[in-house]
Amino acid sequence: RNYYLKKQNTILNAFQTSSINNKIEIYNETTGVHFLMKIKSEKAEKDIINNAFSKGIKLSPLSQYYKNNEENNNIYVMNYSSLDSEKIELIVEKLKQCI
């Protein structure tokens, strides 16, 4: 449990101190090994997902769980359970390039 709490703190801190902090909102950061992240971007959700995938990042859009998904565009379920803590800064930097 402490292992994942430390990992969570590391990833949240990486996002909060990065230059994309003003382009994201993080929700439910106290719920296990995942949180929700809204990306404030003019880019379409599909484009962000494809750009991230091309950089080795798999994003899970919240919209896939809703019938009327327009309200939930660019909100992603961020699961960090298998994430290598040493690569968090690199992942944030790659994600920055996608949005």
What label would you give each PLM region?
Residues 4-12, 24-38:
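Conserved glycine-rich beta-strand-loop-beta hairpin in the small C-terminal domain of fold type I
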Residues 23-24, 63-67:
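Short, solvent-exposed loop/turn elements at beta->coil junctions and helix N-caps
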Residues 37-41, 80-82:
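Short beta-strand-to-loop capping motifs
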Residues 42-49, 85-90:
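Short, conserved charged micro-motifs
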Residues 54, 69-99:
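PLP-dependent enzyme catalytic core of the Aspartate aminotransferase-like
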